[in-house]
Amino acid sequence: MVRNETNPTGCRVRDGTSVRGVPSVTLENAHVKVVVLTGKGADVFEFRHQPSDTDLLFKTPWGVIDPKTHVHDSFEPGATFMDFYHGGWQELLPNAGRPCAYKGAELGFHGEI
């Protein structure tokens, strides 16, 4: 991380952090704080307006679940995604929607990333 001591409100990047055991990176300045769950691809977990301390993203009641400690026990399509869904803002690549096959490749509910 590079700090600019002459501009204390400049952007800061903190890596090596985690949310409930899932690795994350935090980007913030005086106006916005963004927490990205790098341990889950690039899920944006928090998008906070700093002056009002308002997180603009939905959160599930169960929050972040660490895939290293949770046993998935459902075979229903889409259940794996929902087991680990914490709210926030997900990247949905290469598929946004129901599980499907494309050119012989099986794509899970809301992608594979």
Describe these PLM feature segments:
Residues 1-113:
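Surface-exposed acidic/polar loop and edge beta-strand patches at domain peripheries
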